[in-house]
Structures are given as structure tokens and as C-alpha cells.
Amino acid sequence: MYQDLIRNELNEAAETLANFLKDDANIHAIQRAAVLLADSFKAGGKVLSCGNGGSHCDAMHFAEELTGRYRENRPGYPAIAISDVSHISCVGNDFGFNDIFSRYVEAVGREGDVLLGISTSGNSANVIKAIAAAREKGMKVITLTGKDGGKMAGMADIEIRVPHFGYADRIQEIHIKVIHILIQLIEKEMAK
């Protein structure tokens, strides 16, 4: 009944991944991001992560697998997803939705920390404001974006961009794979 649809969806996902893999710059960016994160942890820093919708879930997934575990047991790493509902509702109500991440970065971000900002379009105003707040604090910035990078293009120390111009879910599928690879590489770097 839906076999053709299922095959088409899986083929499109595979094609998106294949296109991402064609650009060696993506591989190098992932490696540089993992080393940057591990170096921050080794120096006593932490990572703050943020995004909206599915990207928010990815930010939370990233943090929980750093503080908890990925594939094997190991010490937890300092990671916070900016996801506290009371913070988000307070700042959203009192200041505006565009400030929900930047206010948190202003409150807890420190020089030597890293911000991971996730936006499939690269145009999320609240993530862009978080990047600006991170810069003010002397933090490093890594972004996961899609399409042409949007307004976030060029704003990060390291941008990992999925150049897919279709639906956002294809970009998110690559983002979650990148997140898992980052964690795996961080674990290897931390074991050195």
C-alpha cells in the first residue's frame, strides 16, 4: 500500500546523507567541533545548547548524552540544554521569545564555554541572539544549520551545514547523526 512512499523517503534520506558526505569540509568541521568541545571540557568549561522545535529536542538529546551516556559508561561531561520551562516561560513573557536563549547564556555562560546553536534554516532569531550573547561572554560557537546557512552563516567558529533545500526533517536527520558522531569523538578526545 505505502511501499513506494517508504522506499522514496528512505532513498531521499540516503541521498541527503550522500550529498553531505561529498563535501570534505563537513568531515573536517565535525572533527574540529569535537576537539573544540573536548578542549573546553578539559579546561573546566561547559557546553550550552539551544534550538527550536525539533532542533530543541536535538539540543536536549545532545546534552543528555553528554551528561548521561552514549554507547558506553564513562564520566558525565558538563552540558546544559537551554530547556527549562520556567525560564523559557518567564523570559518569553517578560522579555520576548527572541530572548529565551540569550538571557540564559548571559546568566551562566563563561569565557571558555561553548554554545551549540541548532537551526535548520539558520534564521532562528532567538538562536542568533544567543550567539551574540555567547560572543559577549567570550564563548566559542558551533552551529548546526541547513540550506544556505541563513542569517547564521558565518557567525560561528565552526558551522556544520546540511545543504538541503527541501523539508527540514531531512536536515534534522543529518543533524542527529552529526550529534552522535560529535559525542563519539568527544569521548575519544577525553580519553587521551
Curated annotation (Swiss-Prot):
An additional note in the Swiss-Prot or TrEMBL entry is:
The reaction produces a racemic mixture of D-glycero-alpha-D-manno-heptose 7-phosphate and D-glycero-beta-D-manno-heptose 7-phosphate.
Entry's family note: Belongs to the SIS family. GmhA subfamily.
- A Gene Ontology molecular-function term? carbohydrate derivative binding
Source organism: Escherichia fergusonii (strain ATCC 35469 / DSM 13698 / CCUG 18766 / IAM 14443 / JCM 21226 / LMG 7866 / NBRC 102419 / NCTC 12128 / CDC 0568-73)
Q: What does this protein do?
A: Catalyzes the isomerization of sedoheptulose 7-phosphate in D-glycero-D-manno-heptose 7-phosphate.
Gene name, per UniProt, is gmhA
Q: Name one GO cellular component term.
A: cytoplasm
> Which SUPFAM superfamilies does the UniProt entry name for this protein?
SIS domain
Name where it's found. Answer: Cytoplasm
What the entry lists under InterPro entries is as follows:
GmhA/DiaA, Phosphoheptose_Isoase, SIS_dom, SIS_dom_sf, SIS_GmhA/DiaA_subfam
What top-level class of enzyme does the UniProt entry assign? isomerase
Q: How is the cofactor bound?
A: Binds 1 zinc ion per subunit.
Catalysed reaction per UniProt?
Answer: 2 D-sedoheptulose 7-phosphate = D-glycero-alpha-D-manno-heptose 7-phosphate + D-glycero-beta-D-manno-heptose 7-phosphate
Q: From what superkingdom does this record's organism come?
A: Bacteria
Could you tell me which Pfam families the record lists for this protein?
Answer: SIS_2
Q: How does it assemble?
A: Homotetramer.
Q: Which UniProt keywords apply?
A: Carbohydrate metabolism, Cytoplasm, Isomerase, Metal-binding, Zinc
* Name used for this protein in its record: Phosphoheptose isomerase
Q: What is its EC number?
A: 5.3.1.28
